Amino acid sequence: FASASAGLSANVLYAEIGLQGQLGEQVFAAGLRSAERLGQRSGILAIADMTQPSTAKRLFVIDLDSKMLLVRTYVAHGQGSGDLHCTAFSNREGSHQTSKGLYRVGSEIVSPKHGPALLLHGLDKGLNDQALAREVIIHGADYVSPTFIAQHGRLGRSWGCPAVERQLMPQLIDLLADGGLLYVHGR
């Protein structure tokens, strides 16, 4: 797991990636700590900062090896978690809420409802370990777009999935499939 980021403190890595003014330093540090629990401080780490409103580009895809922010985009939260702000989290089937914590991104699938998607394996017991059973996936959605925000004052909401703009799915699949990490941060 050696990488260019090995040995750097979270605050130095945060500064080198250039995340100031975009992603809170404490949120980045929490995501990095979660990845380090797995012994991983290399590869791709995506962080969804659910403390930001859904009108903000709050999904950050970071290459820890090259110390680069690769993607910053919109991400929806579950309809049971709130409207503009994600204020409630659940690991329970049928809650339609977002689950926080660390996920390992699995293989690409084709969802009958959403098209190309990525499986999510929740790694935090009691927080998100029911992700597969709940069918929580990264998928594209028409309700995740600047146009939807302009019409409704917020993004649409999923049934708990971190949904993104449909046209970004090929890029996210390339970056995250089969081993990338996703950290969902919330209060």
What are these model-derived regions, one by one?
Residues 2-159, 166-175, 180:
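Cell wall/extracellular polymer interaction/catalysis modules
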Residues 182-187:
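Low-complexity, Gly/Ser/Thr/Pro-rich intrinsically disordered linker/tail segments
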